[in-house]
Protein backbone atom coordinates (compact mmCIF):
# COMPACT_ATOMS: atom_id res chain seq x y z
CA UNK A 1 0.00 0.00 0.00
CA UNK A 2 1.30 3.43 -0.88
CA UNK A 3 1.85 6.03 1.83
CA UNK A 4 -1.28 8.04 2.61
CA UNK A 5 0.52 11.23 1.61
CA UNK A 6 0.62 9.97 -1.97
CA UNK A 7 -3.15 10.36 -2.16
CA UNK A 8 -3.32 13.98 -1.06
CA UNK A 9 -5.07 16.23 -3.56
CA UNK A 10 -2.64 18.69 -5.12
CA UNK A 11 -4.92 20.65 -7.41
CA UNK A 12 -8.12 20.45 -9.44
CA UNK A 13 -8.38 21.67 -13.02
CA UNK A 14 -11.59 22.14 -14.98
CA UNK A 15 -12.73 23.12 -18.44
CA UNK A 16 -15.82 23.60 -20.54
CA UNK A 17 -16.41 20.77 -23.04
CA UNK A 18 -19.40 19.61 -25.10
CA UNK A 19 -21.91 16.82 -24.52
CA UNK A 20 -23.62 14.67 -27.15
CA UNK A 21 -26.19 17.35 -27.91
CA UNK A 22 -23.55 19.99 -28.51
CA UNK A 23 -24.28 21.70 -25.21
CA UNK A 24 -21.51 22.75 -22.82
CA UNK A 25 -20.75 20.62 -19.78
CA UNK A 26 -18.03 20.43 -17.13
CA UNK A 27 -14.89 18.31 -17.22
CA UNK A 28 -12.78 18.15 -14.05
CA UNK A 29 -9.34 16.68 -13.50
CA UNK A 30 -8.04 15.92 -10.00
CA UNK A 31 -4.26 15.73 -9.56
CA UNK A 32 -2.68 13.94 -6.58
CA UNK A 33 0.68 14.53 -4.89
CA UNK A 34 1.92 11.18 -6.22
CA UNK A 35 1.42 12.31 -9.82
CA UNK A 36 -1.70 10.27 -10.50
CA UNK A 37 -4.79 12.00 -11.80
CA UNK A 38 -8.41 11.29 -12.59
CA UNK A 39 -10.77 12.89 -15.07
CA UNK A 40 -14.57 13.00 -15.29
CA UNK A 41 -17.17 14.70 -17.48
CA UNK A 42 -20.73 15.21 -16.26
CA UNK A 43 -23.87 14.55 -18.33
CA UNK A 44 -27.12 16.52 -18.45
CA UNK A 45 -30.77 15.62 -18.97
CA UNK A 46 -33.54 16.81 -21.29
CA UNK A 47 -36.51 15.70 -19.19
CA UNK A 48 -35.33 16.73 -15.75
CA UNK A 49 -37.17 16.21 -12.48
CA UNK A 50 -38.17 19.34 -10.59
CA UNK A 51 -36.39 18.02 -7.51
CA UNK A 52 -32.99 17.40 -9.13
CA UNK A 53 -29.82 19.11 -7.96
CA UNK A 54 -29.17 22.40 -9.75
CA UNK A 55 -26.93 22.69 -12.82
CA UNK A 56 -25.05 25.98 -12.94
CA UNK A 57 -25.41 27.64 -16.37
CA UNK A 58 -24.02 31.00 -17.46
CA UNK A 59 -27.01 32.56 -19.18
CA UNK A 60 -26.39 35.29 -21.74
CA UNK A 61 -26.00 34.85 -25.48
CA UNK A 62 -23.10 32.39 -25.72
CA UNK A 63 -24.19 28.79 -26.29
CA UNK A 64 -27.81 30.01 -25.96
CA UNK A 65 -27.21 30.64 -22.28
CA UNK A 66 -26.04 27.09 -21.59
CA UNK A 67 -22.36 27.81 -21.04
CA UNK A 68 -20.71 26.46 -17.88
CA UNK A 69 -17.74 28.79 -17.47
CA UNK A 70 -19.17 29.98 -14.16
CA UNK A 71 -19.17 26.38 -12.91
CA UNK A 72 -15.60 25.94 -14.16
CA UNK A 73 -14.55 29.08 -12.30
CA UNK A 74 -16.18 27.78 -9.12
CA UNK A 75 -13.91 24.74 -9.35
CA UNK A 76 -10.77 26.80 -9.91
CA UNK A 77 -11.48 29.54 -7.40
CA UNK A 78 -13.38 27.75 -4.60
CA UNK A 79 -13.31 23.96 -4.81
CA UNK A 80 -9.66 23.38 -5.73
CA UNK A 81 -8.17 25.48 -2.88
CA UNK A 82 -10.58 23.88 -0.39
CA UNK A 83 -9.72 20.30 -1.37
CA UNK A 84 -5.96 20.81 -1.56
CA UNK A 85 -4.31 18.56 1.04
CA UNK A 86 -7.32 16.27 1.53
CA UNK A 87 -6.89 12.55 0.89
CA UNK A 88 -8.62 11.41 -2.28
CA UNK A 89 -9.23 8.07 -0.56
CA UNK A 90 -11.69 9.77 1.81
CA UNK A 91 -14.44 10.24 -0.76
CA UNK A 92 -17.01 11.01 1.91
CA UNK A 93 -14.90 13.85 3.35
CA UNK A 94 -14.25 15.31 -0.10
CA UNK A 95 -17.93 15.28 -1.03
CA UNK A 96 -19.07 16.49 2.38
CA UNK A 97 -16.74 19.49 2.22
CA UNK A 98 -18.03 20.52 -1.20
CA UNK A 99 -21.62 20.21 0.03
CA UNK A 100 -20.82 22.33 3.09
CA UNK A 101 -19.11 25.02 1.03
CA UNK A 102 -22.09 25.10 -1.33
CA UNK A 103 -24.48 25.55 1.58
CA UNK A 104 -27.73 25.07 -0.34
CA UNK A 105 -30.17 22.12 -0.37
CA UNK A 106 -29.90 21.67 -4.16
CA UNK A 107 -26.24 22.65 -4.76
CA UNK A 108 -27.27 25.85 -6.52
CA UNK A 109 -24.29 27.86 -5.25
CA UNK A 110 -21.36 25.86 -6.64
CA UNK A 111 -23.57 23.91 -9.06
CA UNK A 112 -24.18 20.17 -9.08
CA UNK A 113 -22.32 19.96 -12.38
CA UNK A 114 -19.12 21.37 -10.86
CA UNK A 115 -19.40 19.38 -7.62
CA UNK A 116 -20.14 16.10 -9.40
CA UNK A 117 -17.31 16.47 -11.91
CA UNK A 118 -14.83 16.86 -9.05
CA UNK A 119 -16.44 14.08 -7.01
CA UNK A 120 -16.18 11.53 -9.83
CA UNK A 121 -12.70 12.66 -10.86
CA UNK A 122 -11.52 12.20 -7.26
CA UNK A 123 -12.60 8.56 -7.25
CA UNK A 124 -10.94 7.93 -10.58
CA UNK A 125 -7.71 9.57 -9.39
CA UNK A 126 -7.66 7.23 -6.39
CA UNK A 127 -8.26 4.18 -8.57
CA UNK A 128 -5.50 5.27 -10.95
CA UNK A 129 -3.08 5.88 -8.06
CA UNK A 130 -3.79 2.38 -6.74
CA UNK A 131 -3.53 0.98 -10.29
CA UNK A 132 -6.88 -0.80 -10.04
CA UNK A 133 -10.03 -0.51 -12.18
CA UNK A 134 -12.66 1.96 -11.00
CA UNK A 135 -15.25 -0.80 -10.45
CA UNK A 136 -12.84 -2.56 -8.10
CA UNK A 137 -12.03 0.65 -6.23
CA UNK A 138 -15.71 1.54 -5.76
CA UNK A 139 -16.74 -2.04 -5.05
CA UNK A 140 -15.16 -5.09 -3.47
CA UNK A 141 -13.81 -8.52 -4.52
CA UNK A 142 -17.40 -9.71 -5.05
CA UNK A 143 -18.16 -6.93 -7.53
CA UNK A 144 -18.38 -9.23 -10.53
CA UNK A 145 -22.02 -8.93 -11.66
CA UNK A 146 -22.47 -7.59 -15.19
CA UNK A 147 -25.78 -5.74 -15.63
CA UNK A 148 -28.68 -6.53 -17.91
CA UNK A 149 -28.88 -3.65 -20.41
CA UNK A 150 -32.16 -1.80 -20.88
CA UNK A 151 -31.70 -0.63 -24.46
CA UNK A 152 -33.70 2.37 -25.63
CA UNK A 153 -34.32 1.51 -29.27
CA UNK A 154 -37.43 3.63 -29.92
CA UNK A 155 -37.24 7.21 -28.67
CA UNK A 156 -40.20 9.50 -28.03
CA UNK A 157 -41.23 12.29 -25.70
CA UNK A 158 -38.55 14.87 -24.93
CA UNK A 159 -35.89 12.72 -26.61
CA UNK A 160 -37.24 12.75 -30.16
CA UNK A 161 -39.08 14.97 -32.66
CA UNK A 162 -42.07 12.63 -33.10
CA UNK A 163 -45.61 12.20 -31.75
CA UNK A 164 -44.94 9.44 -29.19
CA UNK A 165 -45.78 10.57 -25.67
CA UNK A 166 -43.80 7.84 -23.90
CA UNK A 167 -40.11 8.66 -23.86
CA UNK A 168 -38.41 5.28 -24.17
CA UNK A 169 -39.28 1.83 -25.50
CA UNK A 170 -36.54 -0.54 -24.44
CA UNK A 171 -35.27 -4.03 -25.18
CA UNK A 172 -34.18 -6.15 -22.20
CA UNK A 173 -32.08 -9.05 -23.59
CA UNK A 174 -31.81 -11.33 -20.56
CA UNK A 175 -32.10 -14.90 -21.79
CA UNK A 176 -28.37 -15.59 -22.21
CA UNK A 177 -25.47 -16.45 -19.93
CA UNK A 178 -23.19 -13.43 -20.29
CA UNK A 179 -23.17 -9.72 -21.05
CA UNK A 180 -21.44 -10.00 -24.41
CA UNK A 181 -24.17 -12.31 -25.73
CA UNK A 182 -26.83 -9.98 -24.35
CA UNK A 183 -25.21 -7.10 -26.23
CA UNK A 184 -25.07 -9.16 -29.42
CA UNK A 185 -28.74 -10.04 -29.07
CA UNK A 186 -29.72 -6.40 -28.59
CA UNK A 187 -27.58 -5.30 -31.52
CA UNK A 188 -29.13 -7.84 -33.88
CA UNK A 189 -32.64 -6.76 -32.86
CA UNK A 190 -31.65 -3.11 -33.33
CA UNK A 191 -30.64 -3.84 -36.93
CA UNK A 192 -33.76 -5.95 -37.42
CA UNK A 193 -35.86 -3.01 -36.23
CA UNK A 194 -34.09 -0.66 -38.63
CA UNK A 195 -34.87 -3.00 -41.51
CA UNK A 196 -38.54 -3.16 -40.49
CA UNK A 197 -38.80 0.60 -40.29
CA UNK A 198 -37.28 0.89 -43.77
CA UNK A 199 -39.78 -1.64 -45.12
CA UNK A 200 -42.69 0.28 -43.62
CA UNK A 201 -41.45 3.61 -44.98
CA UNK A 202 -40.80 4.96 -41.50
CA UNK A 203 -37.90 7.16 -40.47
CA UNK A 204 -34.69 5.57 -39.22
CA UNK A 205 -33.37 8.87 -37.89
CA UNK A 206 -32.19 8.50 -34.32
CA UNK A 207 -33.02 10.48 -31.20
CA UNK A 208 -30.81 11.81 -28.42
CA UNK A 209 -30.13 8.37 -26.98
CA UNK A 210 -29.44 6.61 -30.25
CA UNK A 211 -32.80 4.92 -30.67
CA UNK A 212 -34.98 5.32 -33.72
CA UNK A 213 -37.53 8.12 -33.73
CA UNK A 214 -40.24 7.03 -36.20
CA UNK A 215 -43.47 9.02 -36.28
CA UNK A 216 -45.65 6.33 -34.73
CA UNK A 217 -49.21 6.98 -33.59
CA UNK A 218 -49.22 5.12 -30.27
CA UNK A 219 -47.32 3.11 -27.70
CA UNK A 220 -49.18 0.04 -28.91
CA UNK A 221 -47.75 0.53 -32.40
CA UNK A 222 -44.26 0.84 -30.89
CA UNK A 223 -44.77 -2.32 -28.83
CA UNK A 224 -45.95 -4.28 -31.86
CA UNK A 225 -42.92 -3.12 -33.85
CA UNK A 226 -40.55 -4.30 -31.13
CA UNK A 227 -42.16 -7.73 -30.93
CA UNK A 228 -41.91 -8.06 -34.71
CA UNK A 229 -38.25 -6.99 -34.65
CA UNK A 230 -37.40 -9.47 -31.89
CA UNK A 231 -38.98 -12.34 -33.80
CA UNK A 232 -37.47 -11.25 -37.12
CA UNK A 233 -34.04 -11.39 -35.46
CA UNK A 234 -34.73 -14.98 -34.41
CA UNK A 235 -35.41 -14.49 -30.69
CA UNK A 236 -38.38 -15.26 -28.45
CA UNK A 237 -40.23 -12.33 -26.85
CA UNK A 238 -40.57 -12.77 -23.11
CA UNK A 239 -38.38 -15.84 -22.96
CA UNK A 240 -35.15 -14.34 -24.26
CA UNK A 241 -35.95 -10.65 -24.68
CA UNK A 242 -38.46 -8.61 -22.71
CA UNK A 243 -39.56 -4.99 -22.95
CA UNK A 244 -39.26 -1.97 -20.65
CA UNK A 245 -40.87 1.47 -20.82
CA UNK A 246 -39.99 4.93 -19.63
CA UNK A 247 -43.28 6.80 -19.70
CA UNK A 248 -41.73 10.04 -18.34
CA UNK A 249 -45.29 10.88 -17.32
CA UNK A 250 -44.42 14.19 -15.68
CA UNK A 251 -43.87 15.55 -19.20
CA UNK A 252 -47.59 15.18 -20.08
CA UNK A 253 -49.10 15.73 -16.60
CA UNK A 254 -50.94 19.01 -16.00
CA UNK A 255 -53.21 19.96 -13.09
CA UNK A 256 -53.81 16.39 -11.98
CA UNK A 257 -54.54 15.10 -15.49
CA UNK A 258 -52.41 13.01 -17.87
CA UNK A 259 -52.77 14.36 -21.42
CA UNK A 260 -51.86 11.14 -23.20
CA UNK A 261 -52.39 10.27 -26.87
CA UNK A 262 -55.18 12.82 -27.21
CA UNK A 263 -57.01 11.69 -24.07
CA UNK A 264 -57.33 13.21 -20.60
CA UNK A 265 -56.74 10.53 -17.97
CA UNK A 266 -56.75 10.67 -14.19
CA UNK A 267 -54.29 8.58 -12.18
CA UNK A 268 -56.55 5.52 -11.96
CA UNK A 269 -57.22 5.60 -15.70
CA UNK A 270 -53.50 5.90 -16.42
CA UNK A 271 -52.84 2.91 -14.17
CA UNK A 272 -55.51 0.90 -16.01
CA UNK A 273 -53.85 1.74 -19.31
CA UNK A 274 -50.44 0.63 -18.02
CA UNK A 275 -52.02 -2.59 -16.70
CA UNK A 276 -53.38 -3.36 -20.16
CA UNK A 277 -49.94 -2.87 -21.68
CA UNK A 278 -48.42 -5.26 -19.12
CA UNK A 279 -51.11 -7.83 -19.94
CA UNK A 280 -50.55 -7.57 -23.69
CA UNK A 281 -46.75 -7.29 -23.91
CA UNK A 282 -43.76 -8.96 -22.18
CA UNK A 283 -43.03 -5.83 -20.14
CA UNK A 284 -40.79 -6.31 -17.10
CA UNK A 285 -40.12 -2.69 -16.12
CA UNK A 286 -41.97 0.64 -16.21
CA UNK A 287 -40.16 3.84 -15.32
CA UNK A 288 -42.02 6.98 -14.25
CA UNK A 289 -45.41 5.47 -15.02
CA UNK A 290 -46.91 8.41 -13.14
CA UNK A 291 -45.81 12.00 -12.48
CA UNK A 292 -43.11 12.98 -10.01
CA UNK A 293 -45.47 14.36 -7.33
CA UNK A 294 -48.46 12.07 -7.85
CA UNK A 295 -47.62 10.16 -4.65
CA UNK A 296 -51.13 8.76 -4.13
CA UNK A 297 -51.21 7.53 -7.69
CA UNK A 298 -47.81 5.84 -7.31
CA UNK A 299 -49.01 3.90 -4.25
CA UNK A 300 -52.05 2.77 -6.23
CA UNK A 301 -49.83 1.82 -9.18
CA UNK A 302 -47.53 -0.22 -6.94
CA UNK A 303 -50.52 -2.01 -5.41
CA UNK A 304 -51.80 -2.85 -8.88
CA UNK A 305 -48.59 -3.82 -10.68
CA UNK A 306 -45.77 -4.01 -8.10
CA UNK A 307 -45.89 -7.79 -7.89
CA UNK A 308 -45.81 -8.16 -11.68
CA UNK A 309 -43.24 -5.69 -12.97
CA UNK A 310 -40.44 -3.45 -11.81
CA UNK A 311 -41.77 0.06 -11.11
CA UNK A 312 -38.88 2.49 -11.36
CA UNK A 313 -38.88 5.96 -9.84
CA UNK A 314 -36.74 8.43 -11.77
CA UNK A 315 -38.31 11.90 -11.50
CA UNK A 316 -40.12 10.52 -8.44
CA UNK A 317 -36.91 9.90 -6.47
CA UNK A 318 -34.19 11.86 -8.36
CA UNK A 319 -31.50 9.69 -6.69
CA UNK A 320 -32.36 11.47 -3.44
CA UNK A 321 -32.44 9.46 -0.20
CA UNK A 322 -35.09 11.72 1.37
CA UNK A 323 -37.53 11.17 -1.48
CA UNK A 324 -36.60 7.48 -1.62
CA UNK A 325 -37.37 7.08 2.10
CA UNK A 326 -40.79 8.63 1.51
CA UNK A 327 -41.38 6.21 -1.35
CA UNK A 328 -40.36 3.25 0.79
CA UNK A 329 -42.72 4.28 3.60
CA UNK A 330 -45.62 4.95 1.22
CA UNK A 331 -44.87 1.85 -0.91
CA UNK A 332 -44.77 4.01 -4.01
CA UNK A 333 -42.52 1.84 -6.21
CA UNK A 334 -40.07 -1.07 -6.02
CA UNK A 335 -37.06 0.34 -7.86
CA UNK A 336 -35.01 3.51 -8.20
CA UNK A 337 -33.24 4.93 -11.22
CA UNK A 338 -29.74 6.10 -10.35
CA UNK A 339 -28.45 9.19 -12.16
CA UNK A 340 -25.33 10.63 -10.61
CA UNK A 341 -26.05 14.19 -11.71
CA UNK A 342 -29.52 14.22 -10.14
CA UNK A 343 -27.97 14.32 -6.67
CA UNK A 344 -24.50 15.67 -7.47
CA UNK A 345 -21.93 13.58 -5.56
CA UNK A 346 -20.66 10.03 -5.70
CA UNK A 347 -21.15 9.59 -1.94
CA UNK A 348 -24.85 10.49 -2.09
CA UNK A 349 -25.29 8.26 -5.12
CA UNK A 350 -23.83 5.28 -3.26
CA UNK A 351 -26.01 6.08 -0.24
CA UNK A 352 -29.14 5.98 -2.41
CA UNK A 353 -28.12 2.61 -3.89
CA UNK A 354 -27.44 1.19 -0.42
CA UNK A 355 -30.77 2.43 0.96
CA UNK A 356 -32.56 0.87 -2.00
CA UNK A 357 -30.83 -2.47 -1.40
CA UNK A 358 -31.65 -2.47 2.32
CA UNK A 359 -35.30 -1.76 1.52
CA UNK A 360 -35.71 -4.48 -1.10
CA UNK A 361 -35.70 -2.04 -4.01
CA UNK A 362 -33.76 -2.68 -7.18
CA UNK A 363 -31.43 -0.04 -8.64
CA UNK A 364 -31.02 0.80 -12.32
CA UNK A 365 -27.83 2.73 -13.10
CA UNK A 366 -28.58 5.27 -15.81
CA UNK A 367 -27.07 7.67 -18.32
CA UNK A 368 -28.64 11.01 -19.31
CA UNK A 369 -29.85 12.08 -22.73
CA UNK A 370 -26.98 14.58 -22.91
CA UNK A 371 -24.03 12.20 -22.52
CA UNK A 372 -20.27 12.15 -23.10
CA UNK A 373 -17.48 9.65 -23.62
CA UNK A 374 -17.18 9.25 -19.83
CA UNK A 375 -17.79 5.60 -18.81
CA UNK A 376 -18.07 5.95 -15.03
CA UNK A 377 -21.60 4.54 -14.90
CA UNK A 378 -20.43 1.25 -16.45
CA UNK A 379 -17.96 0.76 -13.60
CA UNK A 380 -20.55 1.94 -11.08
CA UNK A 381 -23.06 -0.69 -12.20
CA UNK A 382 -20.53 -3.49 -11.66
CA UNK A 383 -19.13 -2.01 -8.44
CA UNK A 384 -22.57 -1.85 -6.81
CA UNK A 385 -23.87 -5.12 -8.33
CA UNK A 386 -26.98 -3.23 -9.40
CA UNK A 387 -27.75 -5.82 -12.08
CA UNK A 388 -29.19 -3.30 -14.54
CA UNK A 389 -27.96 -0.42 -16.67
CA UNK A 390 -29.65 2.07 -18.97
CA UNK A 391 -27.18 3.58 -21.37
CA UNK A 392 -29.09 4.04 -24.59
CA UNK A 393 -29.38 2.32 -27.92
CA UNK A 394 -26.90 0.58 -30.20
CA UNK A 395 -25.75 3.71 -32.01
CA UNK A 396 -24.01 6.99 -31.08
CA UNK A 397 -20.55 6.56 -29.68
CA UNK A 398 -21.31 8.17 -26.31
CA UNK A 399 -23.73 5.25 -25.70
CA UNK A 400 -21.51 2.55 -27.20
CA UNK A 401 -18.61 3.70 -24.99
CA UNK A 402 -20.42 2.35 -21.93
CA UNK A 403 -21.22 -0.97 -23.60
CA UNK A 404 -17.62 -1.35 -24.73
CA UNK A 405 -16.42 -0.62 -21.20
CA UNK A 406 -18.68 -3.37 -19.86
CA UNK A 407 -17.29 -5.79 -22.45
CA UNK A 408 -13.79 -4.99 -21.21
CA UNK A 409 -14.81 -5.46 -17.57
CA UNK A 410 -16.36 -8.83 -18.39
CA UNK A 411 -13.14 -9.83 -20.15
CA UNK A 412 -11.03 -8.70 -17.16
CA UNK A 413 -13.18 -10.68 -14.73
CA UNK A 414 -12.86 -13.83 -16.84
CA UNK A 415 -14.52 -16.88 -15.32
CA UNK A 416 -15.42 -14.85 -12.22
CA UNK A 417 -17.85 -12.73 -14.24
CA UNK A 418 -21.55 -13.29 -13.65
CA UNK A 419 -24.43 -11.92 -15.71
CA UNK A 420 -27.55 -10.60 -14.00
CA UNK A 421 -29.85 -11.75 -16.80
CA UNK A 422 -28.93 -15.37 -16.24
CA UNK A 423 -30.06 -15.07 -12.61
CA UNK A 424 -33.68 -14.41 -13.53
CA UNK A 425 -35.65 -11.28 -14.36
CA UNK A 426 -38.53 -9.76 -12.41
CA UNK A 427 -39.40 -7.24 -9.72
CA UNK A 428 -38.11 -9.59 -7.02
CA UNK A 429 -34.92 -10.83 -8.64
CA UNK A 430 -34.05 -8.57 -11.55
UniProtKB/Swiss-Prot annotation:
Reaction catalysed by this enzyme: (2R)-2-phosphoglycerate = phosphoenolpyruvate + H2O
Pathway(s) the chain acts in: Carbohydrate degradation; glycolysis; pyruvate from D-glyceraldehyde 3-phosphate: step 4/5
A GO CC term assigned to this protein in UniProt: phosphopyruvate hydratase complex
Entry keyword annotation includes Protein biosynthesis: no
Active-site feature positions: 209 (proton donor), 339 (proton acceptor)
Predominant location: cytoplasm
Gene Ontology molecular function, alphabetical: magnesium ion binding; phosphopyruvate hydratase activity
Residues that, per the record, bind (2R)-2-phosphoglycerate: 167, 339, 368-369, 390
Annotated InterPro entries: Enolase, Enolase-like_C_sf, Enolase-like_N, Enolase_C, Enolase_CS, Enolase_N
Pfam families registered for this protein in UniProt: Enolase_C (PF00113), Enolase_N (PF03952)
Binding positions (Mg(2+)): 246, 287, 314
Cofactor(s) demanded: Mg(2+)
GO biological process, one term: glycolytic process
Cofactor binding remark: Binds a second Mg(2+) ion via substrate during catalysis.
HAMAP family: Enolase
Role noted for this protein: Catalyzes the reversible conversion of 2-phosphoglycerate (2-PG) into phosphoenolpyruvate (PEP). It is essential for the degradation of carbohydrates via glycolysis.
UniProt-recorded name of the protein: Enolase
Organism: Prochlorococcus marinus (strain AS9601)
Recorded name of the encoding gene: eno
